[in-house]
């Protein structure tokens, strides 16, 4: 049996180069340099090209986009209702150390989401070591419990789905590459695991020689693997990366940053043009020795290209950055300069980003539900664990909302209810949880005291323009009910000569 690259799935072969490009675009640094994504000039030798790769900076937008998505998705962790799994001895250890590497289940799922955004999808296997323990408690003492492992797409070589009589697609074959070890310059050692519904095979490969080293029964009766896409595609087993467009635009920016670097370097350091027999250098204060009989037309001179194109290249880079923001619906989030969007345009941008994040949360929720079904199957429990990811995300422009509320308050609308609700909205922008609930109670209590005009009060008798104030005029203007006889009027105080200038 052959287990090398010749037996990979056709879609694996179609997407392998793209996966490498996406992960290099996300990683940046030396990984991106090694990808050699700069266009080589005509007659450019290997050393000059390597130097240009080393001098060209890389502005990593892909990593920024992926982590902004992740920060929004995991700002509020998912809620889980375990039902019959409550009290299971393996539940708490699994939640605290899901992959037997010290990471909690939330941290593991967040990492899966990040790498799914990069590659387009990842696979998660939930396995359980073989055990001879008689009870679940003995298994826990031996650390025999379910655990999860993530496989990135380049390590899942082949897969197959089959349609069941009910019409549902079921994973019936999966081949994963578990480890690759470079023994020496000519020898590579690789371990593969092949899953089917009834057996599990472990294969060991050294270069082109493959050998099956272990066969076990699949006691679960199904392949314990879950496919987690970043975005669904029309091809089963292949997801769409969040970087599918942004990575190519980032590469175009990388090309133009190389042009910027060369324009600056060459325009600041002109090239000395001289005849072969002239003794000269281009350094500051250098002395040029010319033959006495040299033709005047052959005098040395400096060749300096124009740097006028620099602004055009920089403007092109800015346009591409704006394109990346539009592709990822990040125009209102990633903008570093003053945003000139209208309120409606910005709200639309937030809504589009919120819809994208909500779709991602639904995919994660579905994947986690499948993982908990596998957990319950391994532990012999009823698979009734419920998972709830946030359906909407707090994407708000706090400055604009606060300004709007302040303007609304200053309009002078005669409504105590409206004033209370405005105060509550302002509190919502600043506080949360218990502090917010307490603030709402205080606002309502304060409004009931300040807005209580059931008893008579005193009002001034005259307007500022000397017009007479009627007894119930103030109540009518602020929307309160009239009282019998109206409010009492304050009698004007007669001024004396000693009151002049006193305030």
Give residue spans per PLM region.
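Extended, helix-rich architectural segments
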Residues: 1-151
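Intrinsically disordered, low-complexity boundary segments flanking structured domains
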Residues: 8, 105-114, 136-137, 143-147, ...
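Short amphipathic alpha-helical segments
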Residues: 90, 101-104, 108-109, 116, ...
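A short, surface-exposed helix-loop junction/capping segment
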Residues: 92-97, 300-302, 350
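Short secondary-structure capping micro-motifs at structural edges
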Residues: 108-112, 308-311, 356
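Extended, regular secondary-structure scaffolds
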Residues: 113-117, 121-233
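Extended, charged amphipathic alpha-helical segments
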Residues: 207-348, 448-459
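C-terminal helix-loop subdomains that flank or include functional centers
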Residues: 293, 312, 319-503
């Amino acid at each position: 049996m052959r287990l090398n690259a010749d037996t990979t799935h056709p879609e694996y072969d179609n997407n392998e180069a793209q996966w490498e490009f996406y992960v290099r675009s996300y990683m940046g640094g030396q990984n991106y340099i090694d990808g050699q994504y700069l266009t080589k000039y005509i007659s450019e030798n290997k050393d000059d090209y390597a130097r240009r790769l080393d001098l060209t900076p890389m502005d990593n937008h892909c990593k920024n986009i992926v982590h902004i998505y992740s920060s929004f998705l995991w700002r509020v962790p998912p809620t889980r209702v375990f039902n019959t799994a409550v009290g299971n001895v393996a539940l708490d250890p699994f939640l605290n150390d899901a992959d037997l590497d010290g990471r909690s289940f939330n941290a593991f799922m967040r990492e899966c989401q990040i790498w799914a955004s990069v590659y387009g999808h990842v696979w998660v296997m939930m396995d359980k070591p073989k055990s001879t323990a008689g009870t679940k408690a003995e298994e826990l003492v031996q650390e025999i419990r379910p655990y999860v492992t993530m496989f990135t797409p380049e390590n899942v070589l082949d897969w197959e789905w089959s349609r069941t009589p009910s019409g549902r697609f079921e994973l019936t074959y999966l081949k994963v590459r578990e480890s690759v070890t470079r023994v020496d310059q000519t020898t590579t050692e690789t371990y593969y695991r092949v899953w089917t519904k009834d057996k599990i095979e472990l294969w060991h490969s050294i270069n082109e020689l493959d050998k099956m080293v272990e066969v076990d029964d699949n006691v679960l009766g199904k392949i314990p693997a879950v496919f987690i896409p970043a975005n669904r595609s029309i091809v089963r087993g292949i997801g769409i990366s969040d970087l599918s467009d942004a990575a190519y635009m980032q590469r175009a920016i990388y090309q133009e940053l190389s042009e910027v670097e060369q324009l600056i370097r060459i325009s600041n350091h002109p090239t000395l043009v001289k005849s072969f027999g002239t003794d000269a250098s281009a350094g500051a204060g250098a002395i040029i020795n010319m033959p006495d009989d040299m033709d005047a037309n052959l005098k040395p001179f400096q060749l300096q290209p124009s740097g006028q194109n620099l602004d055009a290249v920089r403007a092109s880079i800015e346009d591409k950055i704006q394109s990346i923001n539009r592709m990822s619906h990040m125009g209102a989030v990633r903008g570093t300069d003053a945003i000139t969007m209208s309120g409606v345009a910005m709200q639309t941008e937030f809504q589009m980003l919120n819809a994208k994040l909500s779709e991602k949360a639904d995919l994660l929720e579905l994947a986690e539900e499948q993982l908990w079904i596998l957990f319950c199957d391994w532990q012999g429990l009823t698979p009734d664990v419920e998972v709830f990811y946030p359906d909407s995300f707090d994407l708000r422009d706090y400055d604009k909302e606060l300004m709007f509320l302040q303007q609304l308050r200053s309009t002078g609308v005669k409504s105590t209810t409206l004033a209370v609700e405005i105060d509550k909205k302002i509190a919502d922008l600043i506080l949360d949880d218990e502090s917010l609930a307490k603030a709402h109670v205080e606002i309502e209590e304060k409004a009931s005291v300040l807005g209580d005009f059931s008893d008579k009060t005193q009002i001034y008798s005259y307007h500022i323009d000397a017009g007479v104030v009627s007894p119930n005029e103030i109540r009518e203007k602020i929307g309160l009910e009239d009282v019998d006889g109206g409010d009492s009027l304050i009698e004007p105080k007669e001024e004396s000569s000693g009151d002049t200038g006193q305030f």
